[in-house]
């Protein structure tokens, strides 16, 4: 309690910022792999949706190939391509950074397909589409039938509903006998796939 009152550092604001960061981390995971409200009180994540999203299987076990990425992109209807992007684990991203074009000739022959961003805050590109990462997503090599990469127009395919803005209440009285101050943080959000045709999922064979 004394630290909150006497410190030159605004510890109260530090606590608030810590809660907000914790909310962001939890939501990032839940919108990707959340298991639903019925049992777990979580949103249904993009990679957990049990029906509706068309899946594209890797051609074979082992390394992801250029053909796998082409199949994933070509499987998405053209009306969603303009705003499409990739979403994957960082380890999968690292593997894709090593992909080169194949074939005997052509502009992509033996050229890296990955386009690193040269502007701070802008995403890297793969085959002309932005790439975003989320470490909650299964990574390539985690096992058969694992969903390892999503591609599509996420704004149209997945809806996030903010049911209640974050509220953080300082509890001055509850722990007063112990010389402590408590904080109660509450935030209610949900999310789910609303337009599965706008999304495609790459899965392990």
Predicted segments with their positions:
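Residues immediately flanking
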Residues: 1, 90, 185-187
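Alpha-helical scaffold segments that mediate packing/assembly in large oligomeric complexes
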Residues: 1-75, 103, 108, 201-205
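Flexible loop/turn segments at secondary-structure boundaries
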Residues: 5-6, 38-39, 92-97, 138-141, ...
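Sequence/fold signature of self-assembling virion shell proteins
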Residues: 9-22, 63, 102-205
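A beta-strand-loop signature enriched in Asp, Gly, Thr, and Trp
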Residues: 51-131
């Amino acid at each position: 309690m004394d630290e909150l009152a006497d410190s030159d550092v605004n510890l109260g604001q530090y606590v608030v910022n810590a809660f907000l960061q914790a909310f962001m981390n939890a939501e990032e995971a839940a919108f990707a792999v959340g298991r639903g409200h019925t049992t777990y009180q979580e949103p249904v994540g993009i990679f957990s949706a049990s029906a509706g999203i068309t899946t594209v299987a890797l051609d074979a076990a082992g390394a992801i190939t250029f053909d796998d990425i082409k199949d994933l992109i070509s499987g998405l209807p053209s009306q969603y391509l303009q705003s499409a992007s990739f979403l994957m684990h960082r380890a999968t991203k690292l593997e894709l950074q090593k992909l080169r074009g194949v074939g005997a000739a052509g502009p992509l022959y033996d050229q890296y397909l990955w386009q690193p961003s040269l502007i701070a805050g802008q995403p890297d590109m793969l085959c002309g589409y932005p790439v975003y990462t989320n470490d909650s997503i299964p990574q390539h090599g985690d096992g058969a039938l694992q969903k390892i990469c999503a591609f599509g127009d996420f704004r149209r395919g997945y809806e996030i509903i903010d049911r209640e803005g974050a509220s953080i209440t300082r509890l001055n009285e509850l722990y007063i006998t112990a010389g402590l101050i408590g904080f109660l943080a509450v935030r209610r959000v949900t999310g789910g796939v609303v337009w599965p045709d706008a999304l495609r999922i790459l899965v392990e064979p």
